[in-house]
Amino acid sequence: MKTITFDKLLLKTAFCCMASDGNIDKREIVLIKTMCGNSPLFTNFNFEVEINNLVSKLNTQGKDFITHYFELLKHSVLTEQEELTLIDFAINTIKADEQIEYSEIKFFKVIRHNLNISDEKVLAVYPDIEQFLEQDIISESYLEKITNQYFDTLELPQFEQIHLFDAHSLDKLKKDE
């Protein structure tokens, strides 16, 4: 299994969370770009190139891209702080479009299952995500079942390449809503 740097894992996590409901919302793009820009982990980093590389891979690989992400996450050795950072990127991305779909909760539960941090520590930082942590994944077979259910209902469209826009365009987008 190929290893991945933590910054790439964070970006891939946020990207997969953004696409997990079958829709890429501009607010999610802006949030991910902002999170990457605010993090010291992303240096010498061209967001537009990196995010569009992920779009292209998702478009060509489809569900295999998501499966590969889960495998990368499963085999990553992360510190507790890195796990909290990954959860932060995931939760904030899921909430960015102000619509939390059940597919996104299922997706997060699969992510959560691959982390070692306790629910108590997660809830201490994110007390409002209890529904994301409810224990319905109780065995490997159930995890496999919920993962398969996620993939069975997932319809990934061909996503457009992402073009960044300036703050003025973002303000206009917010006013149009």
Named regions from a protein language model:
Residues M1-E177:
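Small-residue-enriched hydrophobic alpha-helices in membranes
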